[in-house]
């Protein structure tokens, strides 16, 4: 039995209503779902299918696509059909703004092909048309038995609601700050829309809410309030998180705090990709976040020290990098061949200070020699030292031991 362990207690999640989207369940007692969104022109069937397939293959359980005009709506059933022919059964979420009622009404094949609709109360319609157009979308969802995400975004808030709350706040003896009124508007917009959708006929088990803002502290405040006031399933995401490290850090901090409080049933890490960048990165970051917090296990963990003046070379860094890359590359096949392999923990350490201890805590680990240490690398499996490697082929020998361990422990034959 493995000796790899965590000292933390299991995290308790907020109770929410389960919503079924295709073959994926969001909320209830289901694991937190990772989702993503394409950035292709949906009318370009080839490009959109290719990107959806790439996102699904790295682990996106739901994929959202823009449906912004007739050509995009007409392409949706073709996209779904093409994906199914390729063997990719991916629940597709249609992202609608401004004319969703028109597109869903005039393109019934699109309405049927999608697994879920996303609408924004702030731009579903304006003035006298808003109520009618919102109701039309909900009625279509009821007709086709599709769940809906009511996705509020503070960049496109319902101005009528915002103005009313601002006016009411101004009459108070101790008025709230503008930021507090903005946050309350986001929450009320989501909740009022959900209640209204129910009154039209949509079931509580067909509603997911999101309330996205671009500031970390505001996001935490908004979702904390939303979670207190309802039991709808919640979609977490920091909108306009940005590019590169900043985007990853901002999203991880905001979502991590909420997840630690038990809030959140599905997440998306919204990263602005660099020109020519890999769209799948947002999926990998979401998976890493859920894994390091102990909510999900997607792939083996490789623990490696950062290196310091005690380490003699970059060998342990190169070995750790290669092992992690090989494990990740093989996971698509290994999940079937070696059930449970995603729980594996490997340690690749660079000196005697923490090397042996960390290696003992892993399923399998190696402690490479540092400055002044004997040129030997002990290997530990499930807490026991099983071998000492020496010479110029330590990396290759450890990789061989790792492969044998995976086959022995997780193989079915």
From Swiss-Prot:
Pathway: Isoprenoid biosynthesis; isopentenyl diphosphate biosynthesis via DXP pathway; isopentenyl diphosphate from 1-deoxy-D-xylulose 5-phosphate: step 5/6
Signal peptide: none
Keywords from the UniProt entry: 4Fe-4S, Iron, Iron-sulfur, Isoprene biosynthesis, Metal-binding, Oxidoreductase
GO biological process, alphabetically ordered: isopentenyl diphosphate biosynthetic process, methylerythritol 4-phosphate pathway; terpenoid biosynthetic process
Cofactor annotation: [4Fe-4S] cluster
UniProt xrefs under InterPro entries: Dihydropteroate_synth-like_sf, IspG_bac, IspG_bac-typ, NO2/SO3_Rdtase_4Fe4S_sf
Catalyzed reactions: (2E)-4-hydroxy-3-methylbut-2-enyl diphosphate + oxidized [flavodoxin] + H2O + 2 H(+) = 2-C-methyl-D-erythritol 2,4-cyclic diphosphate + reduced [flavodoxin]
Biological role stated in the UniProt entry: Converts 2C-methyl-D-erythritol 2,4-cyclodiphosphate (ME-2,4cPP) into 1-hydroxy-2-methyl-2-(E)-butenyl 4-diphosphate.
Protein name: 4-hydroxy-3-methylbut-2-en-1-yl diphosphate synthase (flavodoxin)
């Amino acid at each position: 039995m493995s000796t790899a362990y965590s000292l933390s207690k299991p995290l308790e999640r907020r109770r929410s209503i389960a919503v079924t989207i295709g073959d994926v369940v969001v909320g209830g007692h289901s694991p937190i779902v990772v989702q993503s969104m394409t950035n292709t022109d949906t009318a370009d069937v080839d490009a959109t299918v290719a990107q959806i397939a790439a996102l699904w293959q790295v682990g996106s359980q739901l994929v959202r696509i823009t449906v912004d005009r007739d050509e995009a709506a007409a392409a949706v059933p073709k996209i779904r059909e093409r994906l199914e022919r390729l063997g990719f059964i991916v629940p597709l979420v249609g992202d609608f703004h401004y004319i969703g009622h028109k597109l869903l009404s005039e393109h019934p094949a699109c309405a049927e092909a999608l697994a879920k609709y996303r609408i924004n109360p702030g731009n579903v319609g304006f003035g006298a048309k808003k109520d009618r157009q919102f109701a039309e979308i909900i009625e279509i969802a009821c007709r086709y038995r599709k769940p809906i995400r009511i996705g509020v975004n503070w960049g496109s808030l319902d101005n009528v609601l915002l103005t009313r709350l601002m006016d009411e706040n101004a009459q108070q003896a101790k008025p709230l700050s503008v930021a507090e009124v903005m946050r309350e508007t986001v929450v009320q917009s989501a909740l009022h829309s959900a209640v209204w959708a129910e009154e039209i006929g949509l079931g509580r088990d067909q509603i997911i809410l999101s309330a996205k803002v671009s500031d970390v502290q505001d996001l935490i405040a908004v979702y904390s309030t939303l979670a207190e006031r309802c039991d709808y399933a919640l979609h977490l995401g920091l909108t306009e998180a940005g590019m590169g490290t900043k985007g990853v850090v901002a999203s991880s901090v905001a979502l991590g705090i909420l997840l630690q409080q038990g809030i959140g049933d599905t997440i998306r890490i919204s990263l602005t990709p660099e020109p020519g960048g890999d769209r799948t990165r947002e999926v990998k970051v979401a998976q890493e976040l859920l894994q390091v917090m102990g909510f999900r296990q997607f792939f083996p963990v490789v623990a490696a020290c950062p290196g310091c003046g005690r380490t003699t070379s970059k060998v342990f860094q190169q070995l750790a990098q290669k092992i992690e890359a090989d494990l990740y590359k093989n996971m698509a096949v290994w999940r079937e061949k070696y059930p449970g392999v995603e729980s594996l923990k490997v340690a690749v350490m660079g000196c005697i200070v923490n090397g042996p201890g960390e290696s003992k805590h892993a399923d399998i680990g190696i402690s490479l020699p540092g400055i002044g240490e004997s040129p030997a690398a002990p290997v530990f499996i499930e807490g026991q030292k099983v071998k000492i490697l020496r010479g110029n082929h330590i990396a290759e020998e450890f990789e061989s031991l790792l492969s044998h361990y995976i086959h022995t422990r997780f193989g079915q034959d």
